[in-house]
Amino acid sequence: MPTLWSPSTQHHGSSSGSESSPLQKSVRRAQMALSPCSSSILPCDDRDSQGTAEWDSPSTNEDSDFEDSLRRNVKKRAAKQPPKAVPAAKHRKKQSRIVSSGNGKNESVPSTNYLFDAVKAARSCMQSLVDEWLDNYKQDENAGFLELINFFIRACGCKSTVTPEMFKTMSNSEIIQHLTEEFNEDSGDYPLTAPGPSWKKFQGSFCEFVKTLVYQCQYSLLYDGFPMDDLISLLIGLSDSQVRAFRHTSTLAAMKLMTSLVKVALQLSLHKDNNQRQYEAERNKGPEQRAPERLESLLEKRKEFQENQEDIEGMMNAIFRGVFVHRYRDILPEIRAICIEEIGYWMQSYSTSFLNDSYLKYIGWTLHDKHKEVRLKCVKALAGLYSNQELSLRMELFTNRFKDRMVSMVMDRECEVAVEAIRLLTLILKNMEGVLTSADCEKIYSIVYISNRAMASSAGEFVYWKIFHPECGAKAVSDRERRRSPQAQKTFIYLLLAFFMESEHHNHAAYLVDSLWDCAGSYLKDWESLTNLLLQKDQNLGDMQERMLIEILVSSARQAAEGHPPVGRITGKKSLTAKERKLQAYDKMKLAEHLIPLLPQLLAKFSADAENVAPLLQLLSYFDLSIYCTQRLEKHLELLLQQLQEVVVKHVEPEVLEAAAHALYLLCKPEFTFFSRVDFARSQLVDFLTDRFQQELDDLMQSSFLDEDEVYSLTATLKRLSAFYNAHDLTRWEISEPCSRLLRKAVDTGEVPHQVILPALTLVYFSILWTVTHISESTSHKQLMSLKKRMVAFCELCQSCLSDVDPEIQEQAFVLLSDLLLIFSPQMIVGGRDFLRPLVFFPEATLQSELASFLMDHVFLQPGELGNGQSQEDHVQIELLHQRRRLLAGFCKLLLYGVLELDAASDVFKHYNKFYEDYGDIIKETLTRARQIDRCQCSRILLLSLKQLYTELIQEQGPQGLTELPAFIEMRDLARRFALSFGPQQLHNRDLVVMLHKEGIKFSLSELPPAGSSHEPPNLAFLELLSEFSPRLFHQDKRLLLSYLEKCLQRVSKAPNHPWGPVTTYCHSLHPLEITAEASPRGPPHSKKRCVEGPCRPQEEESSSQEESLQLNSGPTTPTLTSTAVKRKQSLRTVGKKQKGRPGPGPGPGPELICSQQLLGTQRLKMSSAPCFQIRCDPSGSGLGKQLTRLSLMEEDEEEELRLLDEEWQRGDKMLHSPSSPSEHGLDLLDTTELNMEDF
């Protein structure tokens, strides 16, 4: 069979003696004319160097060692018969079939919108649309072909059309150049990328049209030569255009056209093979039975098939060489993705011609593409090839060359690409034995524990086929037998345990089970095999293996009962389907039926090990407990209750006690018929614990010393009671009062061990909460006041514990105190619960200060106060950090819910920058919520935080040389972060920023140096911190602040001999004119405002206007909007003449910016309401006085403007100083810039 053109032989084809078609010649000429450095092609470094292997780079001289051997076996296609005259490109001197030969046909411009509108609407059948066009084409070839061409032009977004006159007299390149010049690109969108519902389905309809066009023409016009060859030539030219719309649309059309041609070529190949078999069968007949006429017809048919196939191959070669070879590395990722997707389809559907190393290398090179969508198309194309075992065997060289890249893509930064890469490696593992090494597989093993479920599930499937399937599949013949074979199940469990132990992620069994759930769910839901291994004594399982097997059992039970991934694993699935819910209910029932009888046995066997008992007790959460009643399993319930009591008596670990209390809580629901039996067992257990507690408490209260055993026993009893008080209401046992007496003795005498204090605090706290749950509208006032008295007494005990020597007691007291204050805050009466008003409690100032002091001592710790980080394990440091974050979050809640004064937030805000890595998210959320509560007060708190830090620095270092200290630099960074927290709404925060500046100026000059001293005021350096807020000011406010600063400086008794540095820095931050002017002293700024004609104004007014103009143009310039269309260049000489043609008296000196006032000498700082800089008035029209533009508002008298702004400022001050609610300030609580700031 003649082979397609191979990219590796494009430079060897010139020596062939075969005659090329005009289409091939024109394409070859077009390729030679292409620039190698086209802007639309991605640069490929070192891809043209000689001696480089074909796989290493997409070289134009694409030779390789293995291609030489392949090329020797390829038969060269014989020369065709004299080809049909199919010009690929039109020239003026060469007439084409589209031009009428004097037959008198009217060459009117055809309708150019009919096909485009029909495809865009996608309402009609594409086959009928193409048939209608074919009918029109047969009636008038010229008009029909022009209609098709203009359809593709319109599909590119170009509103211009190709007329018959243009097509007769212009070549393809000239036509494309004309269309490019006429391309009116109002926006960057074109039909393939345009938004909106009308364009949503355009790409699919467009591709369907191209596909149908080839399908309907495969028995007629496809081999006619004229329409298809000319269309391909036009698409090749458009695909090399600089206009993105032309390049994108024509590449898509050419690739879809190529795909349709591949299908036609495949059918021709099948027909040709069938014809060959018929010919051989007819020829092998005897002379009497042989029909010469049939042999001759079969030979003619084979010749026709051969010619048609050569025509198809010629068109495919032209598209591949003219479009794909250049566009697969286009600068636009959408174009690259189209090319890779289509070549993958070619290889799958027509593997005999396309599945070779000459085409595979393009996919291999593109695996390194920087764009996600292109890499994804590459991996999916390869997955389609490797899924076929027959095709995968022909890709051995490609696999060896690009295997490392495919393995590395499992950790791609885009999860979607990583998922497909893992699936690709799974296909390679299944269909190509021995390709992936152990090191390659180990890179995938750890992915089963990551948070992204799609990646973890794909990795789980890979692990299943690599580790479990070879061993488990060998134990059974059929898939049904494999699922039921006990030996296969046992083998699976042992392999799973071995994999789990080697992974070193022993705390993440739930993640491992979830990863394997989709591919090995039947094994994991075989709870009978799992429990048999745990209960049988001859299994020789170690302690670690037993613990892991219990974790796997509990995790599989949770997965089956809940039907969703474990906490922390990301999944895009919203809810379960009806079928999944039905399966979930069935699994939950089977789980309960099997494990309810066995759970007491498991607890009895592993009751001594706390790490095994706690997860086993969690199994009750996944049972349908009604089965105890419906299936008469009360005897197993009795055994379970006995084991629960034994577990509680044996263990004091918090996780075991909490699991036991929760398990008993699940059984103690009144709707169960066995409730009375469970309640009786609970009462027995609590009676036993309370009796022991009373006896041990009496011993403690009567004696001044207890030995270690007595302390341990009392502590264990309190821990058990505290855990059960958390889940059960133990109010009727009245154990709160004895605990309160115990805590009072601990505070008064300090003789109570700290191990006893911790559970006693928690127990009293739970007793108060349970009492709150019993309150209703019928509760008497006396009962409410009694509860409040208990709460206040407990708060006093916790306040006393804040100063305890034991840090655990301090932190526990802080947490409990924060929760109680929050519960009994004014929020308690919200929602129509006014009857709870007597319980509202406001902490005193001493308690508030102690809470803030505790926060400073236990949360905002310096690195040296954290201890030796090397001596502590990482998980210990993480736990300590989480505890500190918990303390900080509790304090911030008290601030936001009005329990503490909002001004206390300054103790938190001032650490925002220094502790941003540890607590940045908490402080940021607190700052956002505080601004929603009161914008004005929140701004004052930010300023207060800076004041506190500055005062502390002054006290430590003194006022001299502050600005060079690292601590002051950190304060500037904090001020900058505070400024960013105001967000982009400059007008919304205008009054707040101005107020902050005024208060900051007052603070900087609040303390003056001693009389006769030459030193600057000690707080003057605070102005440098204020300068970080200057970018948030409006230009008018900056001028007013300069005037306000001048008035404040007038009160300074003695002015310096030289300008004070902080004052100069602050003035520069309010005066962006100087920086702008020095940066570009010549040349007018580009402004769209109208020029103001007329004589020069007085110097002061001119300075004000120039400053305003420079301020408006001092920001970053707008980036140029680059159009892909080629625009006609405007002569620079013409622009120069226009500039010279402006009227003016004559040449003058260039504009200069001259400082009119400086901060000089021994006199006071000279500042006026006018700006500090003025611009020399140039009488000539070319100066800044003429070229700089002004707003019409600035033509008002400046003094009047300043007076109005000053009045507005004073009104803003009155509003800021008056108490008001956030709603009175017009705060938008749903403002996205307030809630989701990304820059601070």
Swiss-Prot record:
Chief site of localization: nucleus
- Stored InterPro entries: ARM-type_fold, Cohesin_Scc3/SA, HEAT_SCC3-SA, SCD, STAG
Q: What spans are recorded as compositionally biased (Polar residues)?
A: 97-108, 1115-1125
Identify one Gene Ontology CC term for this UniProt entry. chromosome, centromeric region
* Signal sequence segment: none
PTM summary from the entry reads: Phosphorylated.
UniProt keyword annotations, A-Z: Cell cycle, Centromere, Chromosome, Chromosome partition, Meiosis, Nucleus, Phosphoprotein
* Tissue specificity comment: Testis specific.
Under SUPFAM superfamilies, the record lists: ARM repeat
Q: What happens when the gene is disrupted?
A: Deficient mice are sterile and their fetal oocytes are arrested at early prophase I leading to oocyte depletion at 1 week of age.
The record's subcellular locations are:
Nucleus; Chromosome; Chromosome, Centromere
- Residue ranges annotated as compositionally biased, kind Basic residues, are 1126-1141
* Record flagged with keyword NADP: no
Q: Where is the composition biased (Low complexity)?
A: 1-25
**Record Pfam families:** HEAT_SCC3-SA (PF24571), SCD (PF21581), STAG (PF08514)
Q: Which GO terms describe its biological process?
A: establishment of meiotic sister chromatid cohesion; female meiosis sister chromatid cohesion; homologous chromosome pairing at meiosis; male meiosis sister chromatid cohesion; protein localization to chromosome
Domain of life per record? Eukaryota
Location of the region described as Disordered in the Swiss-Prot/TrEMBL record = 1-108, 1077-1154, 1213-1240
* Residue ranges annotated for the SCD domain, each copy included: 324-409
Q: Which residues carry this modification: Phosphoserine?
A: 1218
Q: Which family does it belong to?
A: Belongs to the SCC3 family.
Subunit-structure text: Component of the meiosis-specific cohesin complex, which also contains the SMC1 (SMC1A or SMC1B) and SMC3 heterodimer. Such complex likely contains RAD21, or the meiosis-specific related protein REC8. Interacts with CCDC79/TERB1; recruiting cohesin to telomeres to develop structural rigidity.
- Outline what the protein does: Meiosis specific component of cohesin complex. The cohesin complex is required for the cohesion of sister chromatids after DNA replication. The cohesin complex apparently forms a large proteinaceous ring within which sister chromatids can be trapped. At anaphase, the complex is cleaved and dissociates from chromatin, allowing sister chromatids to segregate. The meiosis-specific cohesin complex probably replaces mitosis specific cohesin complex when it dissociates from chromatin during prophase I.
The name this protein carries in UniProt is Cohesin subunit SA-3
Q: Which organism is it from?
A: Mus musculus
